[in-house]
Amino acid sequence: MKKYHLLIVLILLVSVVIGQVPLSDMIEVKGGTFSMGNSSFSRESPTRNVTLSTFYMSKHAVTNVQFAEFLNIYGSQTVKEGEFAGKLLFREDSWGVENNNGTWQAAAGFEQFPAIKVTWYGAEAYCKWAGGRLPTEAEWEYAAKGGINKNTYVYSGSSTASLVAWFYDNSGHTNKQVGTKTANSIGLFDMSGNVYEWCSDWFGRYGDNLSPSADPTGPTSGVSKVIRGGYRSNGASDLHLTHRESISPDESYNFTGFRLVRNVLTPANQIDVIENLLFPNPAKEYVTIHTADEIKNLKIINPEGKLVFDNNVINNFFSVAGFPNGIYLVRILNNSDKAFVQKLLIDR
């Protein structure tokens, strides 16, 4: 029982401090089966039944404040490593994030507005840093429709656009602060209007999409990425829940944002609390990770709850020489996307 309680504490702690997006800002979207698409529109047909696992989705689009925090910790305007290394994360904007003497910050008055001018690569990088990912197109549509509630509204939360969306009739063609319209039935805001939102999928016709009907991820390649939800200058007809558009992953606009999704962490298959994974423990200078698996990512959180390391490791060891004494939380992600968590004591 004691180990189980520790597991819950560690899961919550990891969720709270990595990327500063706490579970209280996430909505659990319970898995289920729904009808995806709309046979009335060629880009949205054919309809098909899709089954999704449970996931968490952020209540709001990622804000300028949150994205600025990421940039200051990440320390680069381009992707630093991996297959997308060198890709631009975002472009500065007077409605978005600006650089002030070397520090990124939200434009004055736009702190709680959706982060904009972010490329798909930037949205993907933020989500990974925050311990999550972008939603698939199927997850996005399912959540916008209210998940297992299976609402039949035209828009996300209502068939009256003005109740739930900023769009052509009421926005004045400017972005609005997140969460200022009514949420849908599961507590998600702004899934219709305000800004389009990136999805993880490459864009393709549904008829050509060979993804499975369970947790589909879209085509394996393409030239543009899916965006969903409509934006503040669309007419109401372009805000319907199955409407889909696409743009190049390198592009960024002042009407395109994104939101975070996290997988559900369960003791059985997602995260283990390990007591002998790190050696030596207590540590002074270097730490070895005792695993035969290749390490995909390592995050270290200091005693104050701040993320102080977020990177890959080489040869399964890393240096803690620059860290003050204290108890740290170490989260290790292997190439099978399984996470392990252990406390590390630094004592010199």
Predicted regions and their residues:
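Surface-exposed recognition segments
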Residues: 43-48, 148-149, 174, 191-266, ...
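A glycine-anchored, Pro-Gly-centered beta-turn/N-cap motif
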Residues: 53, 194, 324-327
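Short, flexible loop/turn segments at beta-strand junctions in immunoglobulin-like
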Residues: 59, 117, 180, 320-322
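C-terminal outer-membrane/trafficking sorting elements
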Residues: 271-348
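Active-site microenvironments of metalloenzymes and redox enzymes
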Residues: 36-38, 51-157, 201-205
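Short, well-ordered junction/capping motifs at the entry into regular secondary structure
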Residues: 109-116, 163-192, 218-219, 245
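Non-cytosolic beta-sheet module surface loops
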Residues: 74, 147, 157, 190, ...
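Short, compositionally biased
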Residues: 2-88, 120-121, 146-149, 164, ...
